[in-house]
Amino acid sequence: VIGGDECNINEHRFLVAVYEGTNWTFICGGVLIHPEWVITAEHCARRRMNLVFGMHRKSEKFDDEQERYPKKRYFIRCNKTRTSWDEDIMLIRLNKPVNNSEHIAPLSLPSNPPIVGSDCRVMGWGSINRRIDVLSDEPRCANINLHNFTMCHGLFRKMPKKGRVLCAGDLRGRRDSCNSDSGGPLICNEELHGIVARGPNPCAQPNKPALYTSIYDYRDWVNNVIAGNATCSP
């Protein structure tokens, strides 16, 4: 996160650190939405993945940190791996549920559509340098605003005129999500309204907001998968 501050240690109990499973390279963020389920971006998918819950600093370990791996992964488009504009979402069923603790608790899905102009909060362990990847040891948090979708249309090549994505950022270019923040939460009104999908290169440019997968638009799919009514798993 560019231009953010270290998150309060108690404000990100739902934030998940996603690692490549073989060499423990940090990949992305994710969000705990249920004791057994995590939501993240599809482009964060790797053959092997490890997920860490209750983490603050990567270099320190809390007593209540928990590690899990995917039991099953669900995508919107069953037999495809290529990411498209508005389907950058993945549900992960954990190998076993996590337990709520001082530093671990799920975040609610949105009950209403997001409102343009809303003050929202983005967080993650991603790059704190807009031009070269310098990952943060602790999660950084920044306040950004939701903008009209048309503001993002045209900023990204081949982007459709409509899509299930949110456009959010600081138009002065001071605060933004960045590389390796992907899959992490965009929180508005204390609900999960978006997950980091993609943004301008370099990050945090004036009048160039980033794109977030709109969770409200996938709410039914998420609930159906969790209820066992969907079979879209590779």
Curated annotation (Swiss-Prot):
GO molecular function: serine-type endopeptidase activity; toxin activity
Any Gene Ontology CC annotation: extracellular region
Principal subcellular localization: secreted
Keywords, in A-Z order: Blood coagulation cascade inhibiting toxin, Disulfide bond, Glycoprotein, Hemostasis impairing toxin, Hydrolase, Pharmaceutical, Protease, Secreted, Serine protease, Toxin
Record-annotated Peptidase S1 domain positions: 1-227
Active site residues according to the UniProt entry: H43, D88, S182
Keyword Glycoprotein: yes
SMART domains found in the cross-reference section: Tryp_SPc
EC number(s) from the headed UniProt entry: 3.4.21.74
Keyword match Endoplasmic reticulum: no
Catalytic activity: Selective cleavage of Arg-|-Xaa bond in fibrinogen, to form fibrin, and release fibrinopeptide A. The specificity of further degradation of fibrinogen varies with species origin of the enzyme
Pfam family, one: Trypsin
PROSITE patterns: TRYPSIN_DOM
Glycan-modified residues: N23, N79, N99, N148, N229
Protein name, as recorded: Thrombin-like enzyme ancrod
Cellular compartments annotated: Secreted
GO BP annotations listed: proteolysis
InterPro entries linked: Peptidase_S1_PA (IPR009003), Peptidase_S1_PA_chymotrypsin (IPR043504), Peptidase_S1A (IPR001314), Trypsin_dom (IPR001254)
Species this chain originates from: Calloselasma rhodostoma (Malayan pit viper)
Disulfide pattern: C7-C141, C28-C44, C78-C232, C120-C188, C152-C167, C178-C203
Biological role: Thrombin-like snake venom serine protease that acts as an anticoagulant. It cleaves fibrinogen (FGA) to split off the A-fibrinopeptides (A, AY and AP), but not the B-fibrinopeptide. The resulting fibrin polymers are imperfectly formed and much smaller in size (1 to 2 um long) than the fibrin polymers produced by the action of thrombin. These ancrod-induced microthrombi are friable, unstable, urea-soluble and have significantly degraded alpha chains. They do not cross-link to form thrombi.
Family: Belongs to the peptidase S1 family. Snake venom subfamily.
Subunit (UniProt): Monomer.
